[in-house]
Swiss-Prot record:
It comes from Haemophilus influenzae (strain 86-028NP). Its main location: cytoplasm. The keyword Cytoplasm applies. It catalyses: dUMP + (6R)-5,10-methylene-5,6,7,8-tetrahydrofolate = 7,8-dihydrofolate + dTMP. Belongs to the thymidylate synthase family. Bacterial-type ThyA subfamily. InterPro entries: Thymidate_synth/dCMP_Mease, Thymidate_synth/dCMP_Mease_dom, Thymidate_synth/dCMP_Mease_sf, Thymidylate_synthase, Thymidylate_synthase_AS. Its EC number is 2.1.1.45. This is Thymidylate synthase. It is found in: Cytoplasm. PROSITE patterns: THYMIDYLATE_SYNTHASE. GO terms for cellular component: cytosol. Homodimer. (6R)-5,10-methylene-5,6,7,8-tetrahydrofolate binds at D183, S282.
Length: 283
C-alpha cells in the first residue's frame, strides 16, 4: 500500500496539468512510476484506503486470457468494465468496423491470442509463452503484447497496460508489465490486481514458483474531477495490512483457464478496508 499512496501523493504534489483530448478533461500528471508486488509471499496489492472490488479485475483479465472481444462475454465472467467503451464511446460507435452492440473489436486478448500476420494467419502469443515456460525455457522473448498500432482502428480502445514480459530464473518466474497510461484513482487498483494475479496464475499452470511482479507506468494521472476525493479523503486514511489471494490449486493448465475457471476459483483472505469512494470514470 505504501508505494501506491506514495505515487498518489507524488501526483498531487508534483504533477502537472495536461489536457486530454479523448475525454475533454485535464489530468494532473507525472511521468514514470515503478511498482513492485511480492507474489512469492502472497502480498496481494488490494487497495485498503477505500473498499476495492477485486473480482471484476480478475474477471476482466481472465477474459483477456480467453481472447474475448465482446462486452457480453466479460459480463458473463462477472465484470461490466467493457460496457462503456463498447457501447458509449462516441468514436467507436461511429467506427465502420464496429459489429454491433457489445462489440469491442480487436483489443487486448484478441491480440494476445490471435495476432494477425501479413498472410492472414494468426499467432497465439500466450500459448507460446506457456509452452516454453512449462519446459523451463526462457528465450528472453517471453513477451505478450496487446499493442498493435496496425489495428488500432479495429478496436474501441488502445491498450493501457499493453505488454507483459516473463523471466525465468532457475525455477522462479518473474513478470514485468508495462503500462502507457494509468487513471490512478480508478484504474491502478485494477491493474495492480491483474499484474499480481497474472504472475500467480502463470507460475501455477507452468509448474514454477512465483517471484516478483514489476509494474512500470509511463503516464500516471489523476483526472481533475477526481483530485478532491483523492487529496481530501483517500490520502487522509491510514492503510490496513495487505490481504492474501487464494487460487484453486486444481487450475493446472491454460486449457483450464480457457474453459471451466470462474470467479468461484479465487478468494481473498484477510481484507480490511475503509469505506468506498465513488470516483468519476472518464470514457
Amino acid at each position: 500500500m505504501k508505494q501506491y499512496l506514495d505515487l498518489c501523493r507524488r501526483i498531487v504534489s508534483e504533477g502537472e496539468w495536461v489536457a486530454n483530448e479523448r475525454t475533454g478533461k485535464h489530468c494532473l500528471t507525472v511521468i514514470n512510476a515503478d511498482l513492485e508486488y511480492d507474489v512469492a509471499n502472497n502480498q496481494f496489492p488490494l487497495i485498503t484506503t477505500r473498499k476495492s472490488y477485486w473480482k471484476a479485475a480478475i474477471a476482466e483479465f481472465l477474459g483477456y486470457i480467453r481472447g474475448y472481444d465482446n462486452a457480453a462475454d466479460f459480463r458473463a465472467l462477472g465484470t461490466k468494465t467493457w460496457d462503456a467503451n463498447a457501447n458509449v464511446n462516441a468514436a467507436w460507435l461511429a467506427n465502420p468496423h464496429r459489429r454491433g452492440v457489445d462489440d469491442m473489436g480487436r483489443v487486448y486478448g484478441v491480440q494476445g491470442r490471435a495476432w494477425r500476420k501479413p498472410n492472414g494467419e494468426t499467432i497465439d502469443q500466450l500459448r507460446k509463452i506457456v509452452n516454453n515456460l512449462t519446459k523451463g525455457i526462457d528465450d528472453r522473448g517471453e513477451i505478450l503484447t496487446f499493442f498493435n498500432p496496425g489495428e488500432f482502428d479495429l478496436g474501441c480502445l488502445r491498450p493501457c497496460m499493453h505488454t507483459h514480459t516473463f523471466s525465468l530464473v532457475g525455477d522462479t518466474l518473474h513478470l514485468t508489465s508495462y503500462q502507457r497510461s494509468c487513471d490512478v484513482p480508478l484504474g491502478l487498483n485494477f491493474n495492480q490486481i491483474q499484474v499480481f494475479t497474472f504472475l500467480a496464475l502463470m507460475a501455477q499452470i507452468t509448474g514454477k514458483k512465483a517471484g516478483k511482479a514489476y509494474h512500470k507506468i509511463v503516464n500516471a494521472h489523476i483526472y481533475e474531477d477526481q483530485l478532491e476525493l483523492m487529496r481530501d479523503v483517500q490520502l487522509k486514511r491510514e492503510p490496513f495490512p495487505l490481504p492474501k489471494l487464494e487460487i484453486n490449486p486444481d487450475i493446472k493448465t491454460l486449457e483450464d483457464l480457457e474453459t471451466w475457471v470462474t470467479m468461484d476459483d479465487f478468494k481473498v483472505v484477510g481484507y480490511q478496508s475503509h469505506e468506498p469512494i465513488k470516483y468519476p470514470f472518464s470514457v
